[in-house]
């Protein structure tokens, strides 16, 4: 048993604790403020240890090459944060999480009851953390939303794997309240799309038109009615934000995209191929000191054509895997589809690459789902 498996419980607890506290004011004072940095260091070290087994995962080669390229970029390019070490730790965090998760789950018998309990507890913790941090944020709800909602929302693939459908939908309801409170258009899109996929999977795809199906449909409608009654003002604000898309260009995203594309086209061939460094879009020589709000553009600008190629390979690898899962009617097909919807929506209108805590939830899920898929294949052969 290697160190990763030996300390697996501690690593999982540290990961959940880090993500629970990351968005709260708690980490801004006292000794607690060192938790994010310590967590990044711990996962970096254990990620290197788990590399030997993690590289054999489905996306192991792609993630390995991408991680290696990110490390090179962190070394050769100046850091936007002023610390190359912190840039290195943050930019590669999701890679190490993928390797660690694969190493933990690859040789472990799946205890579904225990795993479901962890997912349920994590959902509650993330929801409480979001609401706590939301109360302390000065947010103009008519103009912007709360990004911390993505912590609970990116649990949707994990929730889709929970065996008990009633518990699944209770957790979805919890996430729905968070999404409505946050006023994030992308959050509403993720929740709506993934919830519809999950409902189709649970009650239509499997053709189970039973009392439970009808009861759940009624409960969903009652839940929607209740939300409209008690969150009428918030829902009105969300509707207004969607109406403003044409006028504000997605909070100025159209202007931002144009600026990033122009800067990339006007840069020399070396920077176009090798990039400008992690989070370089919001550098000094820009009309707006913000990131690209689109991972395709961000990766292209930060890591160049080489990094963009690796990023596209991740998308293609996931799409190919989904097709294979649906062909064999695997129970993991819809959870993996839900994970890709989260990945795609966030990549198109927001960020995952720049926020390691967000992306870590998805890469950990992909590693877990692959190990579970391999386990199901062995059972079917036997």
Report the location of each language-model feature.
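Aromatic-anchored transmembrane helix interface
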Residues: 33-42, 59-74, 80-104, 123, ...
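Transmembrane alpha-helices of multi-pass inner-membrane enzymes
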Residues: 337-346, 353-382
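A membrane-periplasm/extracellular boundary helix in multi-pass inner-membrane enzymes
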Residues: 181, 199-244, 264-266
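Structural signal for the C-terminal ends of transmembrane alpha-helices
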Residues: 44-54, 101-110, 159-166, 196-207, ...
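Transmembrane signal-anchor hairpin modules in multi-pass inner-membrane enzymes, especially those
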Residues: 1-72, 110-113, 161-166, 324, ...
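Hydrophobic transmembrane alpha-helices and their immediate junctions
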Residues: 4-7, 53-55, 305-344
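Alpha-helical transmembrane segments of multi-pass inner-membrane proteins
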Residues: 94-137, 143-202
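Long extracytoplasmic/lumenal interhelical loops at the membrane interface
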Residues: 247-303
